[in-house]
């Protein structure tokens, strides 16, 4: 568990740039240190925020979990990362990476679906020599998914509009 701030109401969304960069550099460094230790089969890093995120701790935190037996990536395929590519910046430095994450999270909480999301998950992956962040708004899970594993997805046009709006925010970073 990585506690981000002494401020109980703080979050990646609200941090000033210096604090955001410090937290993200520290988290990425701790994650890499656990990976480099070779004590674990895989090391996962993620963040839960909000009442629908699946987390239990309200204080701002990320979780870095070392799995001794399990491969946390075993069920991931390239299909998990398909869709509309909103932003890709080659080998972005950690501070720019943090800024992009903050922009995406602000978009999720303040603009996506009219700003109705109050929860999100943020996942980090090392894949293909790259570090990838995947931010997702969290909602009450549909009974279609719970009972039948059928996902309800937005229409392509809605996804395209969301992607374009978020892309416009991210393009201000470079």
Question: What residues fall within each predicted segment?
Answer:
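HIT superfamily nucleotide-processing domains
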Residues: 1-174
């Amino acid at each position: 568990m990585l506690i981000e701030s002494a401020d109980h109401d703080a979050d990646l969304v609200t941090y000033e740039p210096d604090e955001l960069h410090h937290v993200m550099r520290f988290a990425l460094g701790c994650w890499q240190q656990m990976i480099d230790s070779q004590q674990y089969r895989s090391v996962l890093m993620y963040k839960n925020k909000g009442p629908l995120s699946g987390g239990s701790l309200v204080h701002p935190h990320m979780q870095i979990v070392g799995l001794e037996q399990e491969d946390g990536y075993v069920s991931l395929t390239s299909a998990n990362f398909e869709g509309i590519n909103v932003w890709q910046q080659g080998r972005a430095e950690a501070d720019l990476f943090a800024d992009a994450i903050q922009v995406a999270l602000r978009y999720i909480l303040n603009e996506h679906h009219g700003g109705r999301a109050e929860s999100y998950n943020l996942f980090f992956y090392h894949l293909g020599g790259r570090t990838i962040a995947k931010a997702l708004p969290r909602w009450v899970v549909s009974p279609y998914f719970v009972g039948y594993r059928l996902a309800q997805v937005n229409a392509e046009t809605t996804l395209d509009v969301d992607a374009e709006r978020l892309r416009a925010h991210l393009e201000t970073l470079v």
